[in-house]
Amino acid sequence: MITVSVLTAFKIYMKGLSIFLQKRYFGVALPFIINSLMLSTWLLYTPYILEKLQITESQLGYAFFSMAVGAVTSLSFSSKLIKKYGEGRYTFFSTIGYITLIIGAVLSIELYQLCIILFITGAFAGSMDVGMNGLAALIEKKDRQRFMSACHGFWSLGFFIGASLGSLMMYYITFPFVHMFLLACIALILHLVFFGSLRLEKSEAAIEVKSGTHSLQNKTLLGFAVIGLLVMMTEGAVMDWCTLYMSEEIKAPDLWIGYGLAMFSLFMAVGRFIMDPLSDTYGSKVVIQASLVIVVLGIILVLAGGLLTALFGFSLMGFGVAGIVPEIYRLSSRIEGVNPSDGVATVAGTGYLGFLIGPIIMGYVAESYGYPKIFMLIIVFVAIAFVSARFTFNDNYQQKLISTEKDSRLV
């Protein structure tokens, strides 16, 4: 029985990956890899930046904040530009801009220069985020395939490769700019080779929206935005506080302190690669609600105490959050009466907002009430997200989506 289950899981896993052997689909996934690969490599040089600029960690935090503000700012115009030029061209050029500009971060000699460069880089990163998710949703719709979650899995994979391989390369390449420049050249060449005709991809026609209305006035999109906000706050909370929780509450040995985050990241990547076939089989509603339940089970294990129990809990949390955001990206581009680019931009914007306010809220909770209360608060977030999902996936919404897509599996 166990052997059959393992073989079944392996078949599902390979089904989610095999599509990317085709140039067209790998070209769609490549911007996700480039985005995280360049980001994780740049993050390796934050100690170098601190020493070079003679700034404190809090000052570096301002620089990171400027990057986030740049990303959020870009969301205000991304949708309009995508409608004009198309998802393909927008993704193509925003990726080139991102690759080029992030190199400049290691060349900064003053804090204000770093903040300006990261603000502009963040704007391109935000543009890239909306573009590549919109493009993936468009190709999914045109080709009647599911691979959005796997694209986000490639983002996780790119982050892992950048951090691990980048750490090794730092021993052989002593100049940060040379390292970043070589990586940028490789990324740019791959992008030019594999993106190809995807530059021409564009939604067939814009959806007419009454003037004076805002995307969030659509209750379905608002529901997805709330889910995205809360889930991305959850992701950020684990990434920010997992290591400290392992150290201060679990009292893990130094060797094991980082393994909570490692297990969370690993199972998030694995989950994203396997989630598309599961979504295709059971539907988005089941996947999202089941994933939220898995997150809660993971939190319960994390709070139970004990090193191995906590590691298993973080693994479940990573697997649980893996497919939720990709699913709402996909669904937000298919809402009747909402332009696909508006839907994706709205979900991306609320997600970035979660990353902005999440650390502030969690920092206050940790300082005032202790680290365990962070995870108790996450349970509240997940519960609200679950209720939002219940109301969002109502019969009226499902019928609209089915009539639009002619495919009941999408719900």
Q: Predicted segment positions?
A:
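Pair of pore-lining "gating" transmembrane helices in MFS-fold secondary transporters
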Residues: L21-Y45, F119-I120, N218-T234, S315-F319
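Helix-breaking motifs and short loop linkers at transmembrane-helix boundaries and internal kinks
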Residues: Q54, G86, L107-Y112, K251, ...
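Conserved MFS/SLC helix-loop-helix module at the cytosolic interface between two early adjacent transmembrane helices
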Residues: T73-I109
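C-terminal transmembrane helical hairpin of 12-TM major facilitator-type secondary transporters
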Residues: Y282-I328
